[in-house]
């Protein structure tokens, strides 16, 4: 959906009008060579979720950079408009144009605002690696997105940890940034993918382009599987692998290096059955793109049949609409009905300070005995509550607040998390 144009000065204003509504620009989330992203909120609509405004052609951009920004905008808009509706691809709310001057239009995409990126998760889990639950969750979500966009004929062409973000509302990972995407068989971008996540055939193509030469073949959707394989290997190992994948040792025998990484982790945690993940990653990292497993087939891997449980760190890092409070109720409250009802009412009253509470559950038996599960109307309220309740004193005890998967909560599945 396209909106009307509006005028901006050299710096973004606090408020702008688009789609017949007033939007508050709250903060800058990030910027690149051709675009900046801002957090925005619709004014006059209480409870409406914030959005992400991606503004192409920042102030002062001219010449080739301006042309690149316009081109990137058109490519990303076209891809997102065709790929809308899939739960693992960022939602495009609308498109509009702003003007720094009458002759300098700046294109904008209004997108859903997502949460933590896989890049940030890798920083948190540096050297120890992500949990198998998180790796499995991310792998499945990204493969679902890739299977869909490949079926639609698209290649993402810039899959990397920074372009995979968590959605607190939908409780899944989503792909963003389709500025380098192209239709398979019609590659109109010379340089694709990011160093460290670039498939061998894309590396060759980029080198030829730098030398002014043209490759005989175009890249295919297989480049996305290569990138995902590297991402999953980094999540498992807790290490950045940019230099590893460029080494002669990797080129000579990447399979042996993958085996070594998995063998090293197996010594630390022998109870985790990781060989299915190892085999899945290997199937994505064949040098020959024709041998790489397609996304749809990868979803059938035995790795996805293993019921992993999240670590407590996962439930702190990945927001959801459900909050779990630990260290609130002891056995005395659970065994006395009057005291139990009083303390549950006190907890509910406290939690409602941060937003409407849809439901509240305090199991008297395991699993989940004595834990408090609070379902909020939206993840924004849950995040605010988690931030402010963590470390608070309740009945002389420090409260520990984590998130909890909404899907598991709805099914009544209160599993024991791993420490």
Swiss-Prot record:
Principal EC category? transferase
- Catalytic reaction annotation: L-seryl-[protein] + ATP = O-phospho-L-seryl-[protein] + ADP + H(+); L-threonyl-[protein] + ATP = O-phospho-L-threonyl-[protein] + ADP + H(+)
**CDD domains the UniProt entry points to:** RRM_UHMK1, STKc_KIS
Which parts of the sequence bind ATP? 29-37, 54
Provide a Gene Ontology MF annotation, just one.
ribonucleoprotein complex binding
Q: What is annotated as the active site?
A: 141 (proton acceptor), 158 (proton acceptor)
Q: Which UniProt keywords are present, listed alphabetically?
A: ATP-binding, Cytoplasm, Kinase, Nucleotide-binding, Nucleus, RNA-binding, Serine/threonine-protein kinase, Transferase
Q: What is its EC number?
A: 2.7.11.1
Q: One GO cellular component from the entry?
A: cytoplasm
Domain RRM positions: 324-406
Pfam families noted in UniProt: Pkinase, RRM_1
Q: Which GO terms describe its biological process?
A: neuron projection development; peptidyl-serine phosphorylation; positive regulation of translational initiation; regulation of cell cycle; regulation of protein export from nucleus
Q: What subcellular compartments does it reside in?
A: Cytoplasm; Nucleus
Q: What is its main location?
A: cytoplasm
Q: Domain Protein kinase: where?
A: 23-304
Q: In which tissues is it expressed?
A: In the embryo, preferentially expressed in the developing nervous system.
- Disulfide bridge positions per record: none
Description of how the protein assembles with itself and partners: Interacts with stathmin and CDKN1B/p27Kip1 Interacts with PAM.
Homology family: Belongs to the protein kinase superfamily. Ser/Thr protein kinase family.
Q: What does this protein do?
A: Upon serum stimulation, phosphorylates CDKN1B/p27Kip1, thus controlling CDKN1B subcellular location and cell cycle progression in G1 phase. May be involved in trafficking and/or processing of RNA.
**Stated name of the protein:** Serine/threonine-protein kinase Kist
What is the source species? Rattus norvegicus
Instruction: Supply the gene name.
Output: Uhmk1
